[in-house]
Amino acid sequence: MSAELASRGRKVYFVGLNEYPFLPLVAGLLRTYAEQDERIAAAYDFQEPVFLVAPVQEMADGIVEPDVLALSCYVWNFRRQMKVAKLVKERYPNVLVVAGGPHVPDRPGNFFEKHPYVDVLAHGEGEVAFRELLATRLSDHPDYTAVPGVSVRRGTEAVVGPKAKRLPRLIDTPSPYLLGVMDGAVATCRERGLRFYALWETNRGCPYSCSFCDWGSATMSTLRKFEDERLQDEIEWFARHDVEDLFICDANFGIMPRDLEIAHALAEARGELGAPRQVRVNFAKNSNDRVFDISKTWHDADLLMGTTLSMQSTDMDVLEAIDRKNIGLDNYRKLQQRYAAENIHTYTELILGLPMETARSFRDGIGSLLEAGNHEDLRVYELGILPNAPLNTPEKIEQYGLRTVPKRMYVERPGTPDDEAETFEMVMETNAMPRDAWVESFSFIQAVQFLHNGCYTRYLSIFLRQEHGIGYTRFYEGLQDYFTGRPDTVLGALYLRMRSLYHDYIDMPALPLANLVASQPDMAADLAPYGRRRGWTIDNWGWLRIATDFDRFHTELREYLATLGLDPAGDARLEDVLRFQQDVMLRPDYSPELGKSAEYAHDWPGYFAGGLLRPRRVRVAYGDQSFGANGRYRPVPGDLKAFTMAAIGTSYPVSRMGHFCHRFESAEVTSLAEPVVSEQW
């Protein structure tokens, strides 16, 4: 089958928008499955998918004489796509508008009353329903209500069709990659100089039923897999088409025994043909030996962007409320140690605002994860209410006191109408976490991200925990309390600005979810020397603000230690670790050619790698040549933009792997007999 097919009359358009360039896999899957029907292949002319965001009117104008308009709807594209459908329907009233995807409600309710330009909703898996819709449309008097898995508009009411049909346990659908259907999208991205992700499925389904997520309910839980031969051929396609970035869309990669074989095949393609260069994946929720082996395989092949050790919350009452089972903190600690022994980067994702979560349990959870050894990457997201999530019922919302705000997703272009601005219902208050507690909790974790994950206080806090018994929660709560009362300090100004911003964030729905920093002129001005981005995050801003006032920050940090009963002037070890903590940070003047060294009274790299703390005069020499996942970013002395890429990487995809500070594995530690001094090469 060729992607360049002769015109056959009935035009089919797909729209599936994303702020980031993801290849339109859904459109390809729907098309190739439908075209197995010879009648459909003969009657319809499938157009190139609309997947790159443009002004709504421009996208609508590009849809010319459509017979069918298919929309793949997610929370990040729903409003714009509805507006495209409305404009197209006004111009071409006979077009059949079909909306599918996770944002289409399982229970139509008043959907068609709100969106009368949509004709059909496709629920769940779309291939079978879409093919039957196209086949039905070819009849003289099409009756779409007979198609399984759809709801059909009749006036403003919904007529629900028969139960949906699903693909078999061994999915044998044609591959849009192998049939050339994706070639046009790849060419478009490359012509525009866009870094894109190739989306890829190896299996479908999720056996879990977390109440905040719609994945398990949407896929009806049963795991089904694509054919082995097809997957191997697609891996070769990715490699031969020099696809740099691959996103595996499975809900739980590593849950199936063959997933390790797939991982080896990708690593072999990377080694033999040079691509893919980077793999993003949703790892299996309950991490196991297979996930470790996959991570090790990709780490060794320089493919891995990090391994998820899932949590969402550490509180048992919260986990019960969201129907979630975790791996347990003891097992989590063992996994952290296992991955750390192989220098494999891990990260843990938490959700703020879950049912039953209090400010105390949230902060204690952060502390317990740091105690368990996750010092590099804690990620926290606000709880959003998805249309088809089990949590999204009137009973659950009332039970837990979930109060939401319809947040804008992005900083929209000037003049963007409200009906084109994407929104997401975000939980900003619950019975267990009032608004002020939500604000303070979010400020707390953001500071932990740029101070601890970002390395400014990581080694100091580990030292204080191990040698002085000062727990991580106490240390970071103390920081917040002390500096919030001192607005004239670097951290004090950051804490108070975050508090003010998050109160505004709740009160002002137009303040965006994804581009919050870019919406604030003062924050954008702070970051201007480091480059222009729409995707700056709060922890990016905090980290770079400290980089700007680096020496002042360290002076003020010493003042805070006095509140803990600590005096560096009278504690040689504390003074030594403070110097090490300052020296280990990546700075704008660092030269890969010259390197950097300093001398200490203790072997701090050895200590923080798990050794004993003994007096030992050492020289620590760093020779890092590049930073970030896969070593993509090389710093240039005095070049703030190059420094920023090396220090924090890109805003998307997010990865804290190999950023912020010098790495022990690149350091040379030499024993000395001479007096201890510091120097820079």
Curated annotation (Swiss-Prot):
Effect of W76 to A/F/H: Slight increase in methylation steps
UniProt domain B12-binding: residue ranges: 1-144
Pfam families: B12-binding
Organism: Streptomyces tokunonensis
Residues bound to cob(II)alamin: N18, S72, Y74, V75, H103, G126, E127, D214, C249
Lineage: Bacteria, Bacillati, Actinomycetota, Actinomycetes, Kitasatosporales
E.C. no: 2.1.1.-
InterPro entries for the chain: Cobalamin-bd, Cobalamin-bd_sf, Elp3/MiaA/NifB-like_rSAM, rSAM, rSAM_horseshoe, Tetrapyrrole_Bchl_Biosynth_MTs, ThnK-like
Name of the protein in question: Cobalamin-dependent radical SAM methyltransferase TokK
Family, similarity comment: Belongs to the methyltransferase superfamily.
UniProt binding sites for [4Fe-4S] cluster: C206, C210, C213
This protein's UniProt keywords: 4Fe-4S, Antibiotic biosynthesis, Cobalamin, Cobalt, Iron, Iron-sulfur, Metal-binding, Methyltransferase, S-adenosyl-L-methionine, Transferase
